[in-house]
Regions:
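ABC-fold ATPase nucleotide-binding domain signature/coupling loops
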Residues: 178-211, 220, 304-316
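Primarily ABC-family ATPase nucleotide-binding module
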Residues: 34-91, 170, 247-250
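Helix-to-loop junction immediately C-terminal to a conserved catalytic motif
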Residues: 108
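C-terminal portion of ABC ATPase nucleotide-binding domains
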Residues: 187, 243, 265-316
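ABC ATPase nucleotide-binding domain helical subdomain, centered on the C-loop/LSGGQ "ABC signature"
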Residues: 117-119, 134, 152-198, 242-243, ...
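Cytosolic ends of transmembrane helices, especially the final helix of ABC transmembrane type-1 domains
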Residues: 8-39
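Catalytic Walker B motif of ABC-type/P-loop ATPase nucleotide-binding domains
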Residues: 224-228
């Protein structure tokens, strides 16, 4: 009987500590949610320029832009001066943590610079109605969330009765996903994910990237931002994307972020960011001739592939 009491007490005590741990985790989540709700709204959402020209891309300019994340001891980006011409295809490259994604977020207004100004069509983006400004951009980010709705609703971001199905098919085809969708029982009307629907479809990481790319194309905004859009693609799918890049970016300003330097050679201009600053810029060939950091990184990646190819041939 004594042993039963001790065992029961130990189990009861263990459950208490487990519940306290769960309560602490829930409390942290609640505090995080509260801090989000209490975060001051700095964006201009109630007034401002409500009709920025979105029929064609305009000039984008960053003047002395710096950004430091809240609580950080140093700036992620420092004194960035950059002008992007209408319809220009820009590549942003650099090592991990260089500030590439932060720069993309600044361009589309997800965050405002700590210092400096960003202009779209000669107007400081803070003067735009922020919701109207967001409509100028189609973006594919590394971090994303997809709602459990139909594939058609994901791509079009609208209700089924408002979907342009011909346009959606073209976008899915260029993104390399139409053959997959066509084989599904309900096609674009298939529910995505099994969070709510047991018969929902699930995609691989590469297929999700294609889906997000199709969504960005469907929006047909004048500026397209692609942050590592090929990170989860297999080599064949990646090659197909590069072959279709001109079709994807036709008459648009595009900003292509990648750590694979061979994938940026088709861009008009390449911006190399190092330690939060622009250290080199130019075309692929121009940067190779400079014998700088870009060339060193490019040759390092090329050497890796050559060495692996040599090992494969020896093994055979």
């Amino acid at each position: 009987m004594y042993l039963s009491v001790v065992t029961g007490f130990s189990s009861w005590l263990g459950n208490i500590f487990s519940d306290l741990s769960s309560l602490n985790q829930i409390n942290l989540k609640i505090n995080y949610f509260r801090s989000y709700l209490e975060y001051p709204e700095t964006f201009n959402r109630n007034n401002g320029v409500t009709n920025p020209a979105n029929d064609c891309p305009k000039e984008i300019e960053l003047k002395n832009v710096s950004y430091r994340y809240e609580g950080a001891n140093h700036h992620t980006l420092q004194n960035i001066n950059l002008k992007i011409n209408p319809g220009e295809h820009i590549a942003i490259v650099g090592l991990n943590g260089a500030g590439k994604t932060t720069l993309v977020k600044l361009l589309c207004g997800l965050i405002d610079p700590t210092e400096g100004q960003i202009f779209y069509d000669g107007i400081d983006i803070r003067k735009y109605n922020r919701d109207a400004f967001y409509r100028l951009f189609s973006a594919v980010f590394q971090q994303f969330s997809i709602l459990p709705v139909t594939i058609g609703e994901i791509v079009s971001e609208t209700t089924p009765e408002n979907i342009d199905y011909d346009k959606m098919k073209r976008c899915l085809t260029v993104a390399g996903l139409w053959n997959k969708i066509e084989q599904l029982t309900n096609g674009v009307d298939s529910q995505f994910g099994k969070t709510i629907y047991d018969d929902g479809v699930e995609f691989s990481g590469g297929e999700i990237q294609k889906l997000l790319l199709a969504r960005a194309m469907y929006k047909n905004a004048p500026v397209m931002l692609l942050d590592e859009p090929t990170a989860a693609l297999d080599p064949i799918a990646e090659s197909t994307l590069y072959e279709n890049y001109n079709q994807i970016s036709f008459q648009k300003t595009t900003v292509f972020v990648s750590h694979r330097l061979a994938s940026t050679s088709f861009c008009d201009r390449i911006i190399l960011i190092e330690n939060g600053k622009i250290c080199e810029e130019g075309s692929h060939n121009e940067l190779l001739k400079q014998n700088g950091t870009y060339r060193m990184l490019f040759e390092t990646q090329a050497k890796y592939y050559k060495n692996n190819l040599g090992k494969t041939e020896v093994a055979e």
